[in-house]
């Protein structure tokens, strides 16, 4: 059975669709625009930076599942490299392709119990995927919050 795997797959698809939606709503000039910094608050990043962090979390996890290489995609996801909305969309799609290849490795729900060496410790794949969904949605939520700070547009229902 693939009940849990299919649930994860749907969740990752939803995240991917929201990337594309937010990128289509974000003005090119606002992609890497940061809200003004306030004293005594956490550092804020741009819509583009948060979306890249979100997609990079997914790419790193599925790269680890498929190749056991837990490289942080930080170097090739810098705003200096991905300067346009189109390049960010290309990266988001590339991250999704990596995820699809990784999901194809999982034959049935019992595969989620398999323990693999993650970046800092051995974990079941289920736990890795749950953590990845959480991190990806967290960064994506921040991207939507920054979008709302910079724009007068109403956020879509998600």
Language model segments and positions:
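Acidic/histidine-rich alpha-helical segments that form the ligand environment
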Residues: 80-116, 124-142
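Amphipathic alpha-helical packing segments from all-alpha helical-bundle domains
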Residues: 19-22, 95
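Surface-exposed helix-capping loop/turn segments at secondary-structure junctions
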Residues: 25-32, 102-113, 148-155
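Short acidic-aromatic linear motifs embedded in glycine-rich loops, typified by GG[WY][YF]DAGD(H)
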Residues: 4, 72-84
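Extreme N-terminal tail/first-helix region
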Residues: 1-17
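C-terminal ligand-sensing/allosteric alpha-helical core of TetR-family HTH transcriptional regulators
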Residues: 15, 53-57, 61, 91-98, ...
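Hydrophobic alpha-helical segments and helix-packing faces
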Residues: 12-15, 40-47, 81, 85, ...
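Short, contiguous alpha-helical
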Residues: 9, 20, 31-76, 117-158
């Amino acid at each position: 059975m693939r009940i849990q795997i299919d649930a994860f797959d749907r969740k990752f698809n939803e995240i991917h669709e929201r990337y594309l939606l937010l990128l289509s709503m974000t003005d090119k000039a606002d992609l890497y625009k940061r809200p003004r910094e306030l004293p005594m608050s956490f550092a804020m990043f741009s819509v583009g930076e948060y979306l890249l962090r979100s997609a990079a979390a997914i790419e790193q996890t599925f790269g680890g599942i498929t190749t056991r290489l837990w490289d942080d995609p930080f170097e090739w996801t810098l705003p200096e490299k991905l300067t346009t909305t189109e390049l960010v969309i290309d990266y988001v799609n590339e991250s999704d392709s990596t995820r699809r290849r990784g999901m194809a490795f999982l034959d049935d729900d019992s595969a989620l119990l398999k323990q693999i060496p993650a970046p800092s410790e051995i974990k079941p794949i289920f736990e890795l995927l749950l953590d990845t969904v959480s991190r990806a949605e967290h960064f994506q939520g921040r991207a939507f919050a920054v979008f709302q700070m910079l724009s007068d547009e109403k956020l879509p229902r998600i």
